[in-house]
Swiss-Prot record:
The chain crosses the membrane at residues 6-26. This is PhoP/PhoQ regulator MgrB. It is a single-pass membrane protein. PhoP-regulated transcription is redox-sensitive, being activated when the periplasm becomes more reducing. MgrB acts between DsbA/DsbB and PhoP/PhoQ in this pathway. Represses PhoP/PhoQ signaling, possibly by binding to the periplasmic domain of PhoQ, altering its activity and that of downstream effector PhoP. It holds the Pfam family MgrB. It is found in: Cell inner membrane. It comes from Klebsiella pneumoniae (strain 342). Belongs to the MgrB family. It comes from the Bacteria. May form homooligomers. Probably interacts with the periplasmic domain of PhoQ.
Length: 47
């Protein structure tokens, strides 16, 4: 039962990360000033 809980946690975290990167990409495409620094870093990370 504990193993299942860990798997669920990992899946949820992975899903959140995917959503976060998608959101970042959208923000970068719209060239939002606040995200410009994050976008520069984001380009170096191979998502």
């Amino acid at each position: 039962m504990k193993k299942l809980r860990w798997v669920l946690l990992i899946v949820i975290i992975a899903g959140c990360l995917l959503l976060w990167t998608q959101m970042l990409n959208v923000m970068c495409d719209q060239d939002v000033q606040f995200f410009s620094g994050i976008c520069t870093i984001n380009k170096f990370i191979p998502w």
